[in-house]
Swiss-Prot record:
Chain's gene name: Kr
GO terms for biological process, alphabetical: regulation of gene expression; segmentation
Protein name as it appears in the record: Protein krueppel
Organism annotation: Manduca sexta
Keyword check for rRNA-binding: no
InterPro entries, per database record: Zinc_finger, Znf_C2H2_sf, Znf_C2H2_type
GO MF entry, a single one: zinc ion binding
Length: 76
């Protein structure tokens, strides 16, 4: 947590030299360079680098619309 305050980013990408505060952020970032997409949609052929992107994509198949407009009944 201290790195948030100090700005220290000890983990550097060997490809593009972008720096990260946490080693797992670097690991996820490296997938952009390798093309690895370990998270697969069980409903279609799409694959994702980050699990959060898979979770967001799954709403396409479930029809879930978790966000509501404050001014009308529309959901997104």
């Amino acid at each position: 947590h201290e790195r948030t305050h100090t700005g220290e980013k000890p983990f550097e990408c060997s490809e593009c030299h972008k720096r990260f505060t946490r080693d797992h952020h670097l690991k996820t970032h490296l997938r952009l360079h390798t093309g690895e997409k370990p998270y697969s949609c069980p409903h279609c052929p799409r694959h994702f680098v980050q699990v959060a992107n898979l979770r967001r994509h799954l709403r396409v198949h479930t029809g879930e619309r978790p966000y509501a407009c404050a001014r009308c009944p529309a959901r997104f």
